C-alpha cells in the first residue's frame, strides 16, 4: 500500500507539472508589461468545515496569477504569438478602449455524498468526484463593467487526486476519512468554457474615506464537467474601496 501511494504521489506531481507547462507562465519584465507592473498572486480556499458539514461541494483550492492592467492581451507577454489572433476573435472581451488582464490558474474541486461513512455505492446521492484543472482567463473592464471569458482543462476521476487531498487534510485534522472513494467517478478529461459579466450599479466609493458600492453578476458555463447559469448581487462597504470587482 505504501508503494502504491508513492506512485500516486509521483503521478500527481507529474500531472501538476504538465498543467503548469500547458498554461503560459507570466513573462519577465523584458517580455511583457513595463517594469513596476507586477502580476498579482491569489490563493482561494473553500471548505465546508466552516459550516460543520462534509458533503456535496466540500472543498475547493485555487491558485491564480493575474496580470497588471494592459492595453492589449499581447502586452501580457504570457500568450504565444499564434494564440493572439484567436483571443481577438472571442466575444465580449475585445471592446476597444477598455483595460485588459490575463489570469492563469491551477485548481482542484472536491465533491462527496451526504453519507461519507458508507463504503458501499450510494445510488441516490451525489457521487464522490474530484476535478483538477488548469485555466486561463481574459478580462476586459472599465470602472463600471467587467467581462470575463475563462477556459479550463483538466481531469475528473482518480487522477484528479481529490481522494488523496481529502485524506491528507482529514488526517492532519485527526478526523475520520470518508469511506466511499472507491466508488468515485471514473477518469475523464474535462473542458469548460465560462463567461461572466459584472456591472457596478452603485458607486459611492470615496478615496481615503468610507464608501459603498453594489455589483451585479450574470454568467454561464458550458462543458462536460458542469453546465450552469448563475446570477447574483453583492454590496461592499469599507474604507478606501478599490476600483476592482
Regions picked out by a protein language model, each given a short descriptive name:
Residues 1-8:
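N-terminal secretory signal peptides that target proteins for export/translocation
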Residues 29-73, 101-116:
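Short glycine/proline- and aromatic-enriched beta-strand/turn motifs that initiate or cap beta-hairpins
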Residues 40-49, 75, 210-222:
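Transmembrane beta-strand segments that form the barrel wall of outer-membrane beta-barrel proteins
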Residues 72-76, 144-146:
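Short acidic, Gly/Pro-enriched loop/turn segments at secondary-structure junctions
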Amino acid at each position: 500500500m505504501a508503494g502504491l501511494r508513492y506512485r500516486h504521489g509521483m503521478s500527481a506531481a507529474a500531472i501538476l507539472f504538465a498543467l503548469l507547462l500547458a498554461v503560459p507562465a507570466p513573462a519577465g519584465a523584458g517580455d511583457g508589461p513595463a517594469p513596476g507592473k507586477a502580476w498579482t498572486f491569489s490563493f482561494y480556499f473553500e471548505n465546508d468545515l466552516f459550516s460543520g458539514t462534509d458533503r456535496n461541494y466540500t472543498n475547493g483550492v485555487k491558485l491564480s496569477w493575474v496580470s497588471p492592467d494592459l492595453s492589449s492581451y499581447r502586452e501580457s507577454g504570457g500568450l504565444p504569438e499564434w494564440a493572439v489572433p484567436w483571443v481577438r476573435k472571442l466575444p465580449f472581451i475585445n471592446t476597444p478602449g477598455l483595460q485588459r488582464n490575463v489570469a492563469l490558474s491551477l485548481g482542484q474541486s472536491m465533491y462527496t455524498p451526504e453519507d461519507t461513512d458508507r463504503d458501499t455505492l450510494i445510488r441516490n446521492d451525489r457521487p464522490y468526484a474530484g476535478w483538477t484543472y488548469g485555466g486561463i482567463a481574459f478580462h476586459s473592464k472599465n470602472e463600471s463593467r467587467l467581462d470575463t471569458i475563462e477556459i479550463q482543462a483538466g481531469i475528473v476521476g482518480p487522477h484528479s487526486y481529490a481522494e488523496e487531498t481529502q485524506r491528507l487534510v482529514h488526517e492532519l485534522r485527526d478526523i475520520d476519512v470518508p469511506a466511499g472513494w472507491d466508488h468515485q467517478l471514473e477518469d475523464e478529461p474535462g473542458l469548460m468554457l465560462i463567461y461572466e459579466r459584472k456591472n457596478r450599479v452603485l458607486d459611492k466609493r470615496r478615496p481615503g474615506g468610507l464608501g459603498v458600492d453594489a455589483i451585479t453578476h450574470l454568467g454561464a458555463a458550458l462543458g462536460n464537467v458542469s453546465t450552469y447559469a448563475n446570477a447574483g448581487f453583492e454590496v461592499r462597504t469599507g474604507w478606501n474601496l478599490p476600483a476592482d470587482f
